[in-house]
A protein has these predicted regions:
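Soluble "head" domains of membrane/secretory-pathway proteins
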Residues: 2-12, 27, 31-37, 42-249
Length: 249
């Protein structure tokens, strides 16, 4: 019986360990959680550009969109679990399943949703809101202040929203009736979000089919100020927003 040379055996062990690590990472990404980062300000102030999160895939069960590249020859959801109003979800657009989108669930199947005079109404009742301190940010190098409110959804979920003082086209909408097996989603920055208020033909989200949900956003594991630069090492540590790491609501 011949033994493998020690160097050959060592390289084989390393390759095997790397392969097992890759398989484990793929398995976790496929079955448990999907990493996701925020590319736009539509969910401010809850989620900021530069936030990195994990979306729990088992929260709602599994669909073909739970798999990488939306592969899979089945429809609907396996081990389906209910979606709660107020959940922050990652989903795929029916017209373009390549990208990931993140919004908050506002309307459940059968709900009537409308925005009138800038106030959200669900099933004919205005949602309670209360003004709090303005949200401060930077835009084009200049400080910005945006009116911020706390909104309380039916069921008791409280979360912050932004709403610019001036009324826009998204502040007065028709009444939407959420179809069976679909959800109505909105961004927390109500004046800066192409969401279910906007038809798909106009670049919006429209209603989101249940099978297009990828997962629920539960945890933020990293947050980096987008103003940091590789060329300026002095900004590296300052760019890490440690206070934002943790649960997402």
């Amino acid at each position: 019986m011949t033994r493998k040379p020690r160097n050959e055996s060592s390289w084989f062990d390393i390759a095997k360990s790397v392969a097992l690590a890759l398989l484990l990472a793929i398995g976790i990404r496929t079955a448990l959680a999907k990493p996701f980062h925020v590319p736009s300000p539509s969910m401010e102030p809850t989620l900021l550009i530069g936030d990195y999160m994990l979306a729990s895939k088992f929260a709602y069960g599994y669909s073909r969109h739970s798999l990488p590249l939306s592969l899979g020859g089945f429809s609907g959801r396996l081990f389906e679990r209910p979606v709660a109003r107020g959940d922050i979800v990652v989903f795929k657009l029916p017209r373009d399943p390549r990208g990931d989108y993140v919004k908050r669930v506002i309307g459940l199947p059968g709900d009537r949703v409308q925005v009138a005079g800038g106030v959200l109404h669900i099933n004919g009742a205005a949602v309670a809101i209360g003004r709090i301190a303005d949200f401060q940010s930077i835009g084009d190098g200049q400080p910005l202040r945006t009116p911020r409110h706390v909104e309380t959804l039916p069921g008791g979920v409280r979360h912050e929203i932004l709403h610019a003082s001036q009324m826009g086209t998204l502040d007065d909408t028709p009444e939407f009736v959420v179809p069976p097996g679909h959800y109505f989603v909105m961004g927390d920055d109500r004046s800066n979000s192409l969401d279910s208020r906007v038809p798909a033909g106009m670049g919006g989200v429209d209603f989101v089919p249940a099978e297009n949900l990828v997962g629920r956003v539960d945890f933020r594991h990293l947050s980096v100020d987008p103003e940091w630069r590789w060329s300026a090492p002095s900004t590296w540590l300052k760019a890490l927003r440690f206070e934002r790491i943790g649960g997402v609501g």
